[in-house]
Every structure is written in C-alpha cells, then in structure tokens.
C-alpha cells in the first residue's frame, strides 16, 4: 500500500507513487531494510528521504519532490 494513513495532506496517488519510488530505489541501492522504512517516515519529510534524493542523483529535481512531500 503506497498511501500512508498518517499523512494529513492531499491524497494524490501519483504523488505517493513518485515519492515511494524514491524509497524503493534507495532500498535497492543499499539493500538495508531500515532505509525503506525510515525513508517513508513522517510522510517522507525526513533526512533519509532527502539523502536518498541525493544518492539517486535526483539533485536537479529536488524541489519537485520536496513540493510533493509538502502536498501529502
């Protein structure tokens, strides 16, 4: 399930899938279970999610992802 019921913002399946994909890709990069779970904490508003964006070389679109985090 992509949608986190703890998130209080706008429910947008496309945004959740996009944010969740970052955590999945980051998990695949490091193969550490805590990466995937920590990345999703606090509706993606955390330092691990931000680090994953950097590690996945998504630096040029960070603002787009941060905007998504603020939406959900």
From Swiss-Prot:
Predominant subcellular localization, coarse grouping: secreted
Gene3D superfamilies: Crustacean CHH/MIH/GIH neurohormone
An annotated GO cellular component: extracellular region
Positions where D-phenylalanine occurs in the chain: 3
GO MF annotations, alphabetized: neuropeptide hormone activity
PANTHER family for this protein: ION TRANSPORT PEPTIDE, ISOFORM C
Name this protein carries in UniProt: Crustacean hyperglycemic hormone
Superkingdom in the source lineage: Eukaryota
Post-translational modification: Stereoinversion of L-Phe (in CHH-I) to D-Phe (in CHH-II) the two forms are present in a ratio 3:1 (CHH-I/CHH-II).
Keyword annotations from UniProtKB, A to Z: Amidation, Carbohydrate metabolism, D-amino acid, Disulfide bond, Glucose metabolism, Hormone, Neuropeptide, Pyrrolidone carboxylic acid, Secreted
This protein's record includes keyword Disulfide bond: yes
Similarity annotation: Belongs to the arthropod CHH/MIH/GIH/VIH hormone family.
UniProt function note: Hormone found in the sinus gland of isopods and decapods which controls the blood sugar level. Has a secretagogue action over the amylase released from the midgut gland. May act as a stress hormone and may be involved in the control of molting and reproduction.
Single GO BP term: neuropeptide signaling pathway
Organism (species): Procambarus bouvieri
Cysteines joined through disulfide linkages: 7-43, 23-39, 26-52
Residues modified as Valine amide: 72
């Amino acid at each position: 399930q992509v949608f986190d019921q703890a998130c209080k913002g706008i429910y947008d399946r496309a945004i959740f899938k996009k944010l969740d994909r970052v955590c999945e890709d980051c998990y695949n990069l490091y193969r550490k279970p805590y990466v995937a779970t920590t990345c999703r904490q606090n509706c993606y508003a955390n330092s691990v999610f931000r680090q994953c964006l950097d590690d996945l070389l998504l630096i040029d679109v960070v603002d787009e992802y941060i905007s998504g985090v603020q939406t959900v």
